[in-house]
Design a protein with these regions (language model features):
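N-terminal phosphate/diphosphate-binding loop that engages ATP/GTP or pyrophosphate donors
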Residues: 3-69
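Short, ordered loop/turn segments at secondary-structure junctions
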Residues: 19-22, 69-70, 96-97, 135-137
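Conserved protein kinase catalytic core
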Residues: 24, 74, 100
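Active-site rim loops that border cofactor/substrate pockets in soluble metabolic enzymes
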Residues: 61-87
Length: 156
């Protein structure tokens, strides 16, 4: 979904962000911005991998940032990334846990009835959000998402 929105609005010069609690090895193309105790922030420069950050670049994001965080450093890492993004720039951020700290312009939950869900997102579903179904999202052209007045909205 993130890549679909980026591709649809690539002319807006969107910045992508991916935040994960998984501390995988650094891959080729990740340029270190900051490494602190509990989190690391990188800029993705490799468009050729199957990682979400590379896919965001291929979809048309002007820059993509990647952070590895713990629960206690997530917010700090996010604000570090924002230091590298112009104010009022459109941002697509993939991080369900960030929703516990930040009120986004639009929070999208992807639903797929046929897939076993490993993550418990009941607490996120109680917050304002929009749900898209993964089984039929490919048929929706264009996506009912817009960026107006420096804010993402959905006219679903």
């Amino acid at each position: 979904m993130a890549c679909r929105i980026i591709e649809q609005y690539r002319h807006l010069k969107i910045f992508g962000i991916k935040i994960t609690p998984h501390f995988h090895d650094v891959t080729e193309g990740l340029v270190t911005i900051l490494e602190e105790s509990g989190f690391s922030v990188y800029e993705e420069t490799n468009r050729e991998t199957s990682k979400d950050t590379s896919r965001m670049l291929r979809a048309g994001a002007i820059k993509v940032y990647f952070a590895k965080v713990t629960d206690t450093t997530l917010e700090e890492a996010f604000f570090e990334i924002l230091e590298h993004i112009p104010s009022k720039a459109p941002i697509i951020c993939e991080s369900p846990a960030l929703r516990n700290y930040i009120e986004p312009g639009l929070f999208i939950i992807m639903d797929s009835p046929g897939i076993n869900k490993d993550k418990d997102i009941c607490h996120l579903q109680k917050l304002p959000h929009v749900v898209f179904n993964m089984d039929n999202i490919g048929m929706i052209q264009p996506l009912p998402v817009t960026f107006q007045n420096n804010k993402w909205t959905c006219n679903k």
